[in-house]
């Protein structure tokens, strides 16, 4: 009988750790509740080690633990979202674990999922808001989308790990506009939360300068973009 000698079953349990690691401090923080998908919404995929067998389920709720699986070595993954779909409120959670299916046995699998893309938020200081009539910030991960944070945007965006460029568009009260790239995040990794903060202050010469920070190295020594620099000379 086909199911009696060469097949087993899998009992899977999926959990999700919604904590992200802010690069401005050492303690992890929980992601916004509204962005925390229920594990029942996570999709499942089972792939044999030799690639000869692959099966997917749209959700954990669709998976029947009585499903007969050919004996062999597998990797089972659970995921929510898509690494290639970037944007606001687009977290991508992923977890995977190896599992051995044995004849007429029920193998238990526990999969813990964590954020597999990068969380980015943008904040503007009150001084910054008063100085400029309009402003926006656009981030771009290598090979990914261009995501614009308008002046009123408060949501988090999620992008692929890797290099992330930061572009800022500013409009002064007198109508003069300028666009420049004040900084880049060279190697953002999965599960990190970058809080990009933009501020404006006066330097020792009494000239307005922009300050941008996004990690522990620029938190106390922000990158300064002076009005005298080429990219912002019009400001």
Segments predicted by a language model, with ranges:
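N-terminal, post-signal-peptide region of Sec/Tat-exported proteins
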Residues: 33-58, 64
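Extracytoplasmic cysteine-anchoring/structural motifs
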Residues: 1-43, 68, 75-91, 96-103, ...
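Signal that preferentially marks extracellular ectodomain short beta-strand elements
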Residues: 55-71, 82-85
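Short beta-strand segments within Ig-like beta-sandwich modules, predominantly Fibronectin type-III
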Residues: 54-61, 145-151
